[in-house]
């Protein structure tokens, strides 16, 4: 299992909630941490709290909807640390809970610009530099249980954005060299400020969540999971797919004749 002692970690959306809890967890492992988000006062308070716990932490304002902000974050991180060992692509926002037939397209674009394109920008900009850096690194993006199943009524816009993050991570895993661990962090219901206080109190604490997923990140897992019962919902989805295959497209000898992955592998030189 990998040690993050003396590592350098960048976390977007790192001043509150899951991002802040992960900043503490990495810091307690001995890592140097840079947290980023648009609100300077939240960053200042978060870094002060981290430093009170003896964590080497710095901050930079960053709006993940702007590529130039993420480029500036990368510039600052490499200048501050000399190298970046971990990126936690965490910044995210809620979408209005409205059905597809009633949601304004402006609201849909807004949630995708942060939750998906913000993570795409982070992965592209930091990923390129990590490849050039050439040393062991980790690039994790925060999805959701809604990357796999519907758990909240009328949360289709948010769910679609988190499904898109899953797709990005799965593709990125194949594109990145072996020395870069790429994975999806999969929170269930975590009690953060994204939820109203009476509701948030019912969820897993952000610190507990970080404690559960940190060993998985250290181990380079494809998925870093938490809420145990969610496997029931995930299994239900794939059982439904399997049932349809068994009924309408059952396996047969030589059924890999149209398998695209096999075709692509055969076309590779050598």
Q: How would you name each of these model-derived features?
A:
Residues 184, 196-237:
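C-terminal helical subdomain
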Residues 7, 30, 56, 83-84, ...:
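Active-site loop of short-chain dehydrogenase/reductase
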Residues 8, 15-17:
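Conserved glycine-rich cofactor-binding loop
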Residues 29-45:
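Conserved glycine-rich Rossmann-like NAD(P)H-binding loop of the short-chain dehydrogenase/reductase
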Residues 140-164, 170, 174:
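Catalytic loop of short-chain dehydrogenase/reductase
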């Amino acid at each position: 299992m990998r040690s993050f002692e003396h590592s350098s970690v960048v976390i977007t959306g790192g001043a509150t909630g899951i991002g802040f809890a992960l900043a503490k967890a990495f810091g307690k492992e001995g890592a140097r941490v840079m947290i980023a988000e648009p609100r300077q006062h939240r960053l200042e308070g978060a870094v002060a709290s981290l430093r009170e716990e003896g964590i080497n932490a710095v901050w930079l304002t960053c709006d993940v909807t702007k590529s130039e902000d993420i480029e500036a974050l990368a510039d600052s991180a490499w200048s501050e640390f000399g190298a970046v060992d971990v990126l936690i692509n965490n910044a995210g926002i809620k979408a209005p809970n409205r059905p597809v037939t009633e949601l304004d397209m402006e609201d849909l674009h807004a949630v995708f610009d942060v939750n998906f394109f913000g993570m795409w920008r982070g992965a592209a900009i930091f990923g390129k530099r990590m490849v050039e850096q050439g040393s062991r690194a980790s690039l994790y993006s925060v999805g959701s249980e809604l990357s796999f199943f519907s758990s909240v009524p009328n949360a289709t816009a948010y769910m679609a954005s988190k499904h898109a993050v899953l797709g990005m991570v799965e593709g990125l895993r194949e594109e990145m060299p072996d020395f870069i661990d790429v994975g999806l962090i999969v929170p269930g219901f975590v009690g953060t400020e994204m939820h109203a206080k009476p509701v948030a109190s019912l969820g897993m604490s952000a610190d507990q969540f970080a404690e559960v997923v940190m060993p998985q990140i250290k181990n380079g897992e494809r998925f870093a999971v938490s809420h145990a019962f969610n496997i029931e919902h995930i299994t239900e989805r794939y059982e439904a797919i399997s049932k349809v295959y068994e009924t309408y497209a059952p396996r047969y000898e030589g059924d890999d004749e149209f398998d695209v992955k096999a075709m692509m592998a055969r076309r590779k030189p050598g």
